Amino acid sequence: MIEDLHWLGISWREGPDRGGPFAPYTQSERRGLYVEAWKRLHEAGAIYPCTCSRKDVALAAGAPNDGDDEPIYSGRCRPVESVVRPARPSLRSGLAGRTNASAATQASPDSPAGFNWRFLVPDGEEICFTDLHLGPQRITAGRDFGDFIVWRRDDVPAYQLAVVVDDAAMGITEVVRGADLLKSTARQILLYRALGLQIPEFYHCDLVRDEAGVRLAKRHDSLSIRQLRDGGWTPEQVRSGVPPGKH
């Protein structure tokens, strides 16, 4: 990836290939930062242990799945004292009173290992931010997304927590990414707030799509930059999206 970015003409002052004051850049070397963030969330009562598998969540009655986004969690392991989300009552059907009390009693306050840990979202709260490209955004917790995983049972931080911790530690002030991650931004804003961190600005790019309107993605066997490069594309053609032989 780094080689492909250089080929495209993109440069940077600091990174894995150059070093710099914000090293290390490999997440396996930054574990201490993630564990510290997990402890702060745990002490604040902002997260809870969960034993549900991905299959459990996907098969939960009425659990919606918005394309590439994860299904909204039914709340089976949610603490009983938390407020039942009103936006999607069907998710609670047959699950009332069935929270996993054993997970809460077995989980260690000093280590996240052995459980999925979910962030307890404020149901009904609108997460508002102004995107630098798409303008004002309003995403509702508990309706557009549910309690999400911040630490996985295989003892590694989940994407949402890792990127928040890394961006804050590295002094990132602007985040540029695809428009398919708007809901992830809402989740991450909640984490920034819970951890008392400065929230960066966001710019969500339009997605690159094929002739059928499907976004280009590895899971769909879409061509990679390396394949385009090997196929005779120039950096200018890749940046403009105009293939060789066309003007």
Where are these regions (language model features)?
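N-terminal Rossmann-like or analogous alpha/beta NTP/dinucleotide-binding catalytic cores
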Residues: M1-D68, A179-D180, S184-L197
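Active-site cores that bind ATP or allylic diphosphates and position pyrophosphate for catalysis
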Residues: R54-S90, G94, T105, D110-A217, ...
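Conserved catalytic-core subdomain
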Residues: F22, E211-H247
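Generic detector of well-ordered alpha-helical segments enriched in charged/polar residues
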Residues: I2, V35, A58, S74, ...
